UniProtKB/Swiss-Prot annotation:
InterPro entries: Ribosomal_bL19, Ribosomal_bL19_CS, Ribosomal_bL19_sf, Translation_prot_SH3-like_sf
The protein, known as: Large ribosomal subunit protein bL19
A GO cellular-component term linked to this record: cytosolic large ribosomal subunit
Family: Belongs to the bacterial ribosomal protein bL19 family.
Organism phylogeny: Bacteria, Pseudomonadati, Pseudomonadota, Gammaproteobacteria, Pseudomonadales
Stored PROSITE patterns: RIBOSOMAL_L19 (PS01015)
Function: This protein is located at the 30S-50S ribosomal subunit interface and may play a role in the structure and function of the aminoacyl-tRNA binding site.
Pfam families membership: Ribosomal_L19
SUPFAM superfamilies in UniProt: Translation proteins SH3-like domain (SSF50104)
Gene Ontology MF terms in the entry: structural constituent of ribosome
Record bears the keyword Ribosomal protein: yes
Keywords associated with the record: Ribonucleoprotein, Ribosomal protein
Amino acid sequence: MTNKIILALEAEQMTKEIPTFAPGDTIVVQVKVKEGDRSRLQAFEGVVIAKRNRGVNSAFTVRKISNGVGVERTFQTYSPQIDSMAVKRRGDVRKAKLYYLRDLSGKAARIKEKLA
């Protein structure tokens, strides 16, 4: 049983509109990057390989291949650093955690698209 004050604070922080996505989906995350005194948006596009649903502590991991090297980045879902998220493609997978994609490369690492 959690404290009502904590629940109220967490509900207040979870006001951001988050699109519905699941592991296997390809998403584009617009991240706020601060360089010196100016700020800009940087897009990170990849496949969601893990999702952790814990209220305000929710997080998800996105994997992409950049110049032949696998890059993974974990985002806090309700972080103020995330400007926006968009789902580009729905993936058809049977597992909740797609860590096996780390060992695959090229065409073997493709994910089938979910049709309707």
